[in-house]
Amino acid sequence: MVRYEHDGSVTIIADSYNGKRLNSPNDIVAHPDGSYWFTDPPYGGQLYEGAPDAAGGPSNAAGRLKPRLGQPPEIGNMKRELPNSVYRADPSGKLDLVIGQDQIPNPNGLAFSPDYKKLYVISTGRGPGDAHAGGNRDMHVFDVAGNN
């Protein structure tokens, strides 16, 4: 997750959790306390998006250029290190795991209630060609208190 500064420079806010590379931060929402909350699905872990998940990795079990359709990749051997999750980055960049894959399968899409006391998270369903079970397509609601 990066921030573009007014002078054109880029500041990395967060790129790992507990020493493991984030997948592809997505669906970011800002909180009035200065924190950013985001989902971290594997969508960027595909070669056509610039960061391949190697053959046999969680996002690319078949070892394809575009796992749902494509051809075998010729480059890259990095495998995804983290499950799909929801994180909170405080203003200093410290990350907290807020919601894990075990709580919501395939979290993707989130929003705060107008008073910021609730966090809504969508569980993405299985897509065509996906090898994994996918989420349940439900909207989940969580109370927000402090950093979780």
Question: What function would you assign to each model-found segment?
Answer:
Residues 1-148:
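Sequence-structural signature of mature extracellular/luminal beta-sheet repeat domains
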